[in-house]
Swiss-Prot record:
The keyword Hydrolase applies. Its EC number is 3.1.26.5. SUPFAM superfamilies: PIN domain-like (SSF88723). This is RNA-free ribonuclease P. CDD domains: PIN_VapC-like (cd18691). GO terms for molecular function: ribonuclease P activity. It comes from Pyrococcus abyssi (strain GE5 / Orsay). InterPro entries: PIN-like_dom_sf, RNA_free_RNase_P. Pfam families: PIN_5. NCBIfam families: PRK04358.1-3 (NF003342), RNA_lig_partner (TIGR03875). The keyword Nuclease applies. Keywords: Endonuclease, Hydrolase, Nuclease, tRNA processing. RNA-free RNase P that catalyzes the removal of the 5'-leader sequence from pre-tRNA to produce the mature 5'-terminus. One of its GO terms (biological process) is tRNA 5'-leader removal.
C-alpha cells in the first residue's frame, strides 16, 4: 500500500495549487477525485494540525463527506518514534548558523540606516524580509512541519510538499518525498497504472 503524507502546499501555495484548481476548494475537489479513483490502493494522510490549516482555506460543505473518507487524519505517535541523535545535532548546528546569519543581516541594516537616515522605514522592511529568510527558509519552523515528518517516518510514507525545509529534513531522515509541483502528474500516472492493471485482470 502506497501512503502519501500531505502538506498544506498542495492546496494553499498558489504556484502548486493552480495545477489542481484556481482556489483551495477547487484544488481539494480535484484531488479528491484522484483519491476516489485510487481508493483501496493508495492512502492519503494528514496530521491534525496540517488538516486544520488546510480547512481554514477550504469550504468544508463543498468537500464533505469525501474529505473525511479519503484523507486520514492521524497524529504521529510522538512517544514511540525514535529520532537519530545526529538529527538533533544537525538541528542545533543549523539554528546556530541561522542566528549568526540573522545577526549579520541586522548589522547590515543598522549600518545602512546610519548612512541613509531618510529611508529608515524601507530599511526596516528590507531587514524584516531578509531576517525572516535567514532564520526560516529551509528549516522546520513549526510544530505542524515536524508532525508531518514524524508521521511519514512512522508510516514509512511519502511526504508531498513544496516546503524546502520539510523536504530538506525528509532527506536527512531518510524519508521518501515527492515535490508537490509534480504531485498531480504522479496521481495521474497511478490512476493510469491501476486502470491498466484492472484491464489486464479482466482479460485473464
Amino acid at each position: 500500500m502506497i501512503r502519501f503524507v500531505l502538506d498544506t502546499s498542495i492546496f494553499v501555495n498558489p504556484d502548486v495549487r493552480k495545477k489542481f484548481g484556481e482556489t483551495p476548494t477547487k484544488a481539494m475537489k480535484t484531488f479528491l477525485k484522484y483519491a476516489e479513483s485510487l481508493f483501496g490502493h493508495v492512502e492519503f494522510y494528514m496530521p491534525p494540525g496540517i488538516y486544520r490549516e488546510v480547512m481554514h482555506f477550504v469550504e468544508e460543505e463543498e468537500v464533505s463527506p469525501d474529505i473525511e473518507l479519503y484523507i486520514i487524519k492521524k497524529p504521529p505517535n510522538v512517544h514511540d518514534i525514535k529520532i537519530p541523535a545526529f538529527v538533533v545535532y544537525e538541528l542545533i548546528e543549523d539554528i546556530r548558523r541561522r542566528v549568526d546569519k540573522g545577526l549579520r543581516v541586522a548589522e547590515k541594516a543598522v549600518r545602512e540606516s546610519v548612512i541613509d537616515t531618510s529611508n529608515v522605514d524601507k530599511i526596516i522592511q528590507k531587514l524584516r524580509r531578509n531576517y525572516r529568510k535567514a532564520l526560516r527558509e529551509g528549516i522546520l519552523d513549526s510544530k505542524e512541519d515536524f508532525e508531518l515528518i514524524l508521521l511519514a517516518k512512522e508510516l514509512d510514507g511519502i511526504i508531498v510538499s513544496a516546503d524546502v525545509g520539510i523536504l530538506t529534513w525528509a532527506e536527512k531522515m531518510g524519508i521518501k518525498w515527492v515535490d508537490a509541483f509534480k504531485f498531480k502528474e504522479v496521481l495521474e500516472e497511478l490512476v493510469e497504472k491501476l486502470k491498466r492493471s484492472e484491464s489486464e485482470k479482466e482479460r485473464k
